[in-house]
Amino acid sequence: MGKKGVYAGVKADFRYGDESVTRLINTIMSDGKKSVAAKIVYEAMDIIDAKVEDADALEVFRKALGNVAPLVEVRSKRVGGATYQIPMEVKPSRREALAFRWIKQFATRRGGRGMAEKLAAELLDAANEQGASVKKRDEVHRMADANKAFAHFRF
């Protein structure tokens, strides 16, 4: 009989009341420094608010997240000596996790002053269907499309 509790999930952040923002903060966080990660994310949101007049930062953030999250991905499966790349549908939780990971990865690589500015620029580009994170999503979709022939190999 297990004594583990039920996973409570993430709490909504205090500024926007949104769980997705908390997940982004957790993704940005390194070495357990959550307050630093929160400061970076909120600063990026403030930059977005200043740059975009017609929409608030949370709308831009949600649009960016939707544009980066992949619908399908390829997974490797070994069938008789050959390894096939099989296109699979992505679960919603993994979609969001991949989107956050890619946004962080490409924001870090960007040129700019600080991480907050880089993150704001990447989110704005993603919301406008541009930027490296959206290209990554398109690349993953192209890979899945190219390997449609192996879709009958299911896990």
UniProtKB/Swiss-Prot annotation:
GO terms for cellular component: small ribosomal subunit. Transmembrane segments: none annotated. GO terms for molecular function: rRNA binding; structural constituent of ribosome; tRNA binding. Coiled coil: none annotated. GO terms for biological process: translation. Keywords: Ribonucleoprotein, Ribosomal protein, RNA-binding, rRNA-binding, tRNA-binding. The keyword tRNA-binding applies. Part of the 30S ribosomal subunit. Contacts proteins S9 and S11. Belongs to the universal ribosomal protein uS7 family. One of the primary rRNA binding proteins, it binds directly to 16S rRNA where it nucleates assembly of the head domain of the 30S subunit. Is located at the subunit interface close to the decoding center, probably blocks exit of the E-site tRNA. HAMAP family: Ribosomal_uS7_B. This is Small ribosomal subunit protein uS7. It comes from Prosthecochloris aestuarii (strain DSM 271 / SK 413).
